[in-house]
């Protein structure tokens, strides 16, 4: 059984411009050695290959493809689409594939490939990330505030808007976070992400521009978001899917910044990019993992 864990590292220095509206790229530069060493250690411990894909001709050519398809938005969004393009390239070489963002810290030696049977379907995790009253209010197409482009409420609304526009039954209760994805070749092929991009983005332009279920201050924040697109394609293409659950995708963000990860948290996703907080974990003493030589 050929197994792979892969990630992407492209920083704003390499790409020659900022990463859009998102301010955390310097944090990834600073903590790159620590995070890569930990991810590689995990891959080695479970007998999987580990690959880091960076800025180079493959990524430049991919951005050219996006521009030719008229779906290019920014370097940041290109990186998010790139993870699926890479999966499509890798599916002929590996039986089971785990993608994790560089800000994911493996906090276990348990083998995810043995614990979750990916032959039963690709696996991701979705979660609500809003105040309880707004989670409820979103079900009526409204919020008490104008969300940001990257808020889960915006992505979830976009996912539902796409499904509604195309008369597709939403297969996922909540939009997936694609920072951790357990994949198999048949699932990757059935999602058909890159080949579907142009058509889906035309649909996004439609649902963004016309009145619909969601308030205009929500739809006005729609972008060509990979997580909404992926979730829609899983639904539209009837891809067999299972949930990773919070143990395999424990989210650390602004909502729970003061909360230490549970000892049961196997993969910690530092969406807040506060990598220095890992030094305070009682479950691991990981600052020694930083390569200083």
Predicted feature locations:
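A structural signal for short, well-ordered beta-strand segments and their strand-loop junctions
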Residues: 5-7, 49-54, 98-101, 106, ...
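GT-A fold catalytic core of metal-dependent nucleotide-sugar glycosyltransferases
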Residues: 79-146, 182
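Catalytic core and acceptor-binding pocket of nucleotide-sugar-dependent glycosyltransferases
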Residues: 157-278
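Short catalytic/ligand-binding loop motif for oxyanion handling, primarily in non-cytosolic enzymes
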Residues: 13-15, 59-62, 106-109, 114-115, ...
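Long, compositionally biased intrinsically disordered regions
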Residues: 265, 280-293
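Charged, glycine/proline-rich intrinsically disordered loops and linkers
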Residues: 16-24, 62-74, 133-167, 204-216
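N-terminal anchoring/stem segment of glycosyltransferases
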Residues: 1-82, 89-93, 221, 225, ...
